[in-house]
């Protein structure tokens, strides 16, 4: 009788082990395809004047929270990613409309400035650098750039969509508008006659004399 009971328990135990071994592993990308966005945050350019001397130092800085309210679902989300990055576009408006990253020396005091030769073409790199934010804070991402003009002209800067993929593969997108009282878009208007909604949202203009 003891032997029969033991065999019965062995069969049950074996069945349990088999079920456990066949259990589907947890999907590490349970939120693949999910996107969360916010466009209420700002970046700041300094000094806020519409013109700066050649060789002077300008600053671009920003801070965005890990936790925010998604503007589409109105739900509270938290970004636990260890990377947040995105493009900074630099263009000359006058005297010639062209990509103009080489007209500035851009270095990071907080975060990183990356010449991304893997994901960007040689043509794109003439006007774009990838900004990688500092992610060491438990509640926010931060960046601060030092910008030194190397050539005279009228320029536009645009910090475009900054994004990251969380550990569960959800995509978090931050859209930052310059928080300065005046973005000096009159320079753009004078050159092109109109300002699109995208330019009005992202762009900050100034003159280097």
Where are these regions (language model features)?
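Acidic/polar, low-complexity intrinsically disordered N-terminal segments immediately downstream
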Residues: 25-97, 188, 209
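Short, flexible loop/turn segments at beta-strand junctions in immunoglobulin-like
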Residues: 51, 147-149
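Extracellular Ig-like/FN3 beta-sandwich strand-entry sites
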Residues: 55-57, 150-156
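Structured domain cores in non-transmembrane regions
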Residues: 68-147
